[in-house]
Curated annotation (Swiss-Prot):
The gene is deoD. It comes from the Bacteria. Pfam families: PNP_UDP_1. Phosphate binds at residues 21, 25, 44, 88-91. Keywords: Glycosyltransferase, Transferase. This is Purine nucleoside phosphorylase DeoD-type. It comes from Salmonella arizonae (strain ATCC BAA-731 / CDC346-86 / RSK2980). It catalyses: a purine D-ribonucleoside + phosphate = a purine nucleobase + alpha-D-ribose 1-phosphate; a purine 2'-deoxy-D-ribonucleoside + phosphate = a purine nucleobase + 2-deoxy-alpha-D-ribose 1-phosphate. Its EC number is 2.4.2.1. GO terms for molecular function: purine-nucleoside phosphorylase activity. NCBIfam families: deoD, PRK05819.1, PRK13374.1. Catalyzes the reversible phosphorolytic breakdown of the N-glycosidic bond in the beta-(deoxy)ribonucleoside molecules, with the formation of the corresponding free purine bases and pentose-1-phosphate. The record marks 218 as: Important for catalytic activity. HAMAP family: Pur_nucleosid_phosp (MF_01627). Homohexamer; trimer of homodimers.
Amino acid sequence: MATPHINAEMGDFADVVLMPGDPLRAKHIAETFLEDVREVNNVRGMLGFTGTYKGRKISVMGHGMGIPSCSIYTKELITDFGVKKIIRVGSCGAVRMDVKLRDVVIGMGACTDSKVNRIRFKDHDFAAIADFDMVRNAVDAAKALGVDARVGNLFSADLFYSPDGDMFDVMEKYGILGVEMEAAGIYGVAAEFGAKALTICTVSDHIRTHEQTTAAERQTTFNDMIKIALESVLLGDKE
């Protein structure tokens, strides 16, 4: 049944949901990659759709910006609508010089300056990691598509406009591939409620060099990321 944030019924969502931050990007994914699409959510403008990809039922819905927003939607999808796997598809900023614009990053883990996982884990550190099989399937899908994806840790920041520039030096030292705002929260929700999750990001800007992708470049590389996510779902069905 409907929740305060999702006006759908059980069965409206597939067991796998792709989640970009922007609800309009969710609409674009549904219209571009899925067939037999129908809208299943529009509360607060957070659009959600269900359709099929190569005959496989898949849903796509926005999750908004930041851990609090994405945590609400992922929790409700898992506990109220039977969703088993969530794949965040978004953008990130690079801090390492060997990570380039338009690189696709598969987030096997996510550090964070948020306390959300400490709250749920009795004030202890929680290793916020993606599901191994989902990571492996994404890597295999990327190889099959000819995309040289990077695999490693992300950093989920609470502040988009951070006043602590020195923190980027620490991230680089520890090998962080990209900075975004949601992965650690999504991995924590999945762990708490018995689901599986993965984050795949496209590098849209470089924090060190101040380079940014153009709208056309973002669209092309974004499509590569979505194809990886969708094909990884099909690979997961073969397990």
